[in-house]
């Protein structure tokens, strides 16, 4: 039987050395599932609540003992005997048990850990890999996503003078995920060499990308183009560029305060700034180009470049179906970033991806800056209509773990493996 026998949670460490929650679910047939919950640095104000202890004498207040205790008592007691394979029913019980709009009573970290661990256990009970199990539920033919590789870190992810949070390469001109991964890796190592040649730091940020000081934000783009060429690839053909502007982080008093550029721009001026970059560089995707509450600015940007550039809402939508529907109805952005801990259960995550597909929006499955060795998001990216995955750079085991899982999945799919490549940008009318 795939009913739940027991649930257990513990406090572990994430990639930033902060506590996070790990949950384990054991079924009556002996099947077992484990999942660890990620944590973000730049967070949307409307995200589901990550429950922290607030005890400054322990882990600087970032402990998660309260969330762990909620799993080991309230949640474990309520879900004992529940069918693990009924993911929607299980998640509905979790949501009702919490009873708040933002999952703040028990903690989204408590709910998500159990939700994902239950899926792992149910997959094990059905003798399937998680991606196979989820694909059977979604009815989607598995495919390998395009990786959005964050090779230069700035903003909240690094201690440097770069305003924008992520500068990414997307290896689209390849026929397999493994070849795309190889290209990205070679560009990463080429970039290290280029940075050294310019006398710049090769220390890495939270997500494994390099975090040097540049004279301007655009210098980061120019340096990446140099690295792509040095690695033997062609920007605009083999490899496209992406940005996570994370503009909510520097939106102050109605202006975009670019310290690295010594500029304070209105929404209209910042849209011009981004549109100019998109015209000058092979940029295919821009995430959080405008601040999360600047819906008028977002609409301006969408109308300006939304037919040529994928515009991804992260802080804007926070993987929340209700907020996402507002974006769909108003024609704001054309893609959504999917972060499991922004919404707090697996079912709601899958529904957000399905919503995107129905609306003609692209879906990008994403890690958080505080990660673990958990690879659940890799399986989700394969088993749904999401066409891209964002899981950091080509170093740090917490990032590489997801890439390695995708390599295993591609191998398991064999001749049936399909890599999204240039078809990944489903929302663009080219």
Curated annotation (Swiss-Prot):
GO biological process: glycolytic process
Active-site residues from the entry: 207 (proton donor), 339 (proton acceptor)
Location of this chain's protein in the cell: Cytoplasm; Secreted; Cell surface
UniProt keyword terms in alphabetical order: Cytoplasm, Glycolysis, Lyase, Magnesium, Metal-binding, Secreted
Cofactor: record remark: Binds a second Mg(2+) ion via substrate during catalysis.
Domain of life: Bacteria
Classification via InterPro entries: Enolase, Enolase-like_C_sf, Enolase-like_N, Enolase_C, Enolase_CS, Enolase_N
Record GO cellular component, one term: extracellular region
Record's keyword annotation contains Magnesium: yes
Residues annotated to bind (2R)-2-phosphoglycerate: 165, 339, 368-369, 390
Reactions this protein catalyses: (2R)-2-phosphoglycerate = phosphoenolpyruvate + H2O
EC category: lyase
Cofactor annotation: Mg(2+)
PROSITE patterns, per the entry: ENOLASE (PS00164)
Role summary: Catalyzes the reversible conversion of 2-phosphoglycerate (2-PG) into phosphoenolpyruvate (PEP). It is essential for the degradation of carbohydrates via glycolysis.
Subunit structure: Component of the RNA degradosome, a multiprotein complex involved in RNA processing and mRNA degradation.
Protein name in UniProt: Enolase
UniProt organism field: Stenotrophomonas maltophilia (strain R551-3)
